[in-house]
UniProtKB/Swiss-Prot annotation:
Keyword Metal-binding: yes
Requisite cofactors: FMN; NADPH; Mg(2+)
Encoding gene, per UniProt annotation: fni
Annotated positions binding substrate: R6, K7, Q152
SUPFAM superfamilies: FMN-linked oxidoreductases
Gene Ontology BP annotations: isoprenoid biosynthetic process
Protein's organism: Bacillus cereus (strain G9842)
Function description: Involved in the biosynthesis of isoprenoids. Catalyzes the 1,3-allylic rearrangement of the homoallylic substrate isopentenyl (IPP) to its allylic isomer, dimethylallyl diphosphate (DMAPP).
Name assigned to this protein: Isopentenyl-diphosphate delta-isomerase
Amino acid sequence: MVRAKRKLDHIEYALSTGQSRTHGFHDIDFVHQSLPNSNYDTITCETKIGELSLSSPIFINAMTGGGGEKTLHINEQLAYVAKQHNLAMAVGSQMAALKDESEAASYKVIRKVNPNGIFFANLGSEATIEQAERAVDMIEANALQIHLNVIQELTMPEGDRDFTGVLQRIEKIVLNSKVPVIVKEVGFGMSKETMQQLANVGVTAIDIGGQGGTNFAAVENERRQRMLSYFNNWGIQTATSIIEATSTNNNLSFIASGGIQTALDVAKAIALGANTTAFAGYFLRILMQDGIEKLVDEIELLHTDLKFIMTALGAKTIEELQSVPLVVKGETYHWLMQRGIDTAHYSRR
């Protein structure tokens, strides 16, 4: 019951605290193309995460599950939306269902709604090989997300305090998993050093989960008697984290998430090097406040606007969008220079 109550608290406080929008994309400007030589009607948006082919560079990221009927209904609606637009979708952490079988229905519902969809299972980094296998089987997942949430756990009144052995557990899961493993942050971003460590143990896909979206430190602080306010602005902004990711020069696939709300955010994230983008809090807010059909319509508009932007840039495919020229400026530029990451190549390609 404690875990289920926490799941419901997370939804309530995530909606009430909102998204910070400090993702850093305001520091990214496209170089205008007066002769784009493009046609809106021939723009395609297919992409890949590792070996997984996706029809869209937008997917529904991990949000909830394990909180009884309310979270079952949310996942049911999100699965319907995913089916309408042929989007991939991740569920929230399934540890609740591994601890309490009665909560499994709140996750399994997605396969009932969308039998042929692409779904990602989800567990924390404390998971064992056996738990990872059970989570994948529970929803017949196409991939497994392992989330890293140190700051959330430290801020959570009942959270973990021991983070030793995490990389070793991830390596074991990667070696034994029958589906691709995606390691994700939850709103605090990832450094290039962290991503290189993950690549070294066989991880092939990372969701950078940057600062700028739902702030789980703020969410957990709402549940505390004594706030740890110093964690409320902790993390690496989304745009910065994407560039840190691409600077590692390995074969990782990257998912950009963290405050992404518009087609321009999507386009900038992909142009910086992401393979796809993920929406969570923004979609949840629309669903809860405006209803399921409004969310279906919003995603349609996102795709339309993304194709407009790609047309303006002369990018006929997602792969071409990844190589359009842009300029990195402001706080993002200064952070990256201090980190020894040169951004000039973005403006000269």
